[in-house]
Amino acid sequence: MVNLAAMVWRRLLRKRWVLALVFGLSLVYFLSSTFKQEERAVRDRNLLQVHDHNQPIPWKVQFNLGNSSRPSNQCRNSIQGKHLITDELGYVCERKDLLVNGCCNVNVPSTKQYCCDGCWPNGCCSAYEYCVSCCLQPNKQLLLERFLNRAAVAFQNLFMAVEDHFELCLAKCRTSSQSVQHENTYRDPIAKYCYGESPPELFPA
């Protein structure tokens, strides 16, 4: 029976339409996975997207993390960190302490909210996750609004594509051109993730 099944399978593989079908399904799966992973990056790069500039950014999150174990409470987070993760409520935690709802486990001692570890007074930080967490402090709202008002039109379109305070901090810390000295050189190779208005000091060449 096994030999018969193997023989039938080999005969099927010799047919071009079967190979084409297998290849097509594999290609669809690959493209679907790629598009899901790149969805946020594509939106950040869409400089030509049209938005209503009179619509204010909603700075308040829609739920309170007071009981983060509630299944109805879902958190977006910074996703890509290998060791650290920042959720949309400003908590930084180790990846292993991330709950299934996407929120950091606030009962773990190492989890910190609005953490500015490794961040300089100019708003530049040594780690992307700390940059986002520090940027999410409520008192940073005026600074971020001032930045948006001063941004060039094309640059402003990029940041107006975000929907709230969390997405603005994700984009600001990830795409800040102020931290670049030359094409492939950071002004400060240590504190290169910036949410603030002032660029880092020039690093000696």
Swiss-Prot record:
It is found in: Golgi apparatus membrane. Residues 36-205 are lumenal. GO terms for cellular component: Golgi membrane. It comes from the Eukaryota. The keyword Cytoplasm does not apply. Its main location: Golgi. Keywords: Glycoprotein, Golgi apparatus, Membrane, Transmembrane, Transmembrane helix. Residues 1-16 are cytoplasmic. The chain crosses the membrane at residues 17-35. GO terms for biological process: positive regulation of SREBP signaling pathway. Glycans are attached at residue 67. Positively regulates hepatic SREBP signaling pathway by modulating the proper localization of SCAP (SREBP cleavage-activating protein) to the endoplasmic reticulum, thereby controlling the level of functional SCAP. Belongs to the SPRING family. This is SREBP regulating gene protein. It comes from Homo sapiens (Human). The lineage of its organism: Eukaryota, Metazoa, Chordata, Craniata, Vertebrata.
